[in-house]
Amino acid sequence: MLHNDDVIAYPTESMFGLGCDPNSKKAVKKLLNLKNRSIEKGLILVASDFDQIKMYVNENILSNKQKKKIFFHWPGPFTFLLPAKPNTPYWLTGKFNTVAVRVSAHFEIIKLCNAFGQAVVSTSANISNMTPCFTSEEVFKCFGKDFPLLNGKIGNEKNPSKIINIINGKLIRYV
């Protein structure tokens, strides 16, 4: 489905997420329209390992200390804002020069990314500013009974991933 520019719902560490092929402008536009979300905000990419996100990240800008901090927290529920490569699509970075990426330890995300063969866009399964979906029933209620859904269990995290800007060290989201 992801290879066909579709958007799917899938379990993440803390809730259901919506995902699509990050390299497909058509798929990302579908996702943004579903959520009523601005392209300016940028999107998070989840991956099963760092190799799946390397094509988006300008590693040359990162210091050894920054790299150590990132890999200390990965895999895990930490999203980092990393310097984006110049060719990273604007629909992923939004109005920023960074890309938000997470190497997950959650089995369902690892399985999804490995089956797809690359990173996947990850955003909460909800309409922007509404309550996220925690069950498949809530996903179907929000997006329709035929919405593509990867069955599985959400993880044990109580909150969305923490977001850390590795460039300036600021914590963007801590809940």
Curated annotation (Swiss-Prot):
Cross-referenced PROSITE patterns: YRDC
Location of the protein in the cell: Cytoplasm
Gene3D superfamilies found in the cross-reference section: DHBP synthase (3.90.870.10)
Transmembrane segments: none
Listed GO biological process terms: regulation of translational fidelity; tRNA threonylcarbamoyladenosine modification
The keyword Iron belongs to this UniProt entry's keyword annotation: no
Catalytic activity: L-threonine + hydrogencarbonate + ATP = L-threonylcarbamoyladenylate + diphosphate + H2O
GO cellular component, one term: cytoplasm
Xref: Pfam families: Sua5_yciO_yrdC
EC number: 2.7.7.87
Keywords for this protein: ATP-binding, Cytoplasm, Nucleotide-binding, Nucleotidyltransferase, Transferase, tRNA processing
Domain (YrdC-like) ranges: 1-175
Example of a GO MF term: tRNA binding
Functional note: Required for the formation of a threonylcarbamoyl group on adenosine at position 37 (t(6)A37) in tRNAs that read codons beginning with adenine. Catalyzes the conversion of L-threonine, HCO(3)(-)/CO(2) and ATP to give threonylcarbamoyl-AMP (TC-AMP) as the acyladenylate intermediate, with the release of diphosphate.
Family classification: Belongs to the SUA5 family. TsaC subfamily.
Protein name: Threonylcarbamoyl-AMP synthase
Species of provenance: Buchnera aphidicola subsp. Acyrthosiphon pisum (strain APS) (Acyrthosiphon pisum symbiotic bacterium)
Lineage: Bacteria, Pseudomonadati, Pseudomonadota, Gammaproteobacteria, Enterobacterales
Gene behind the chain: tsaC
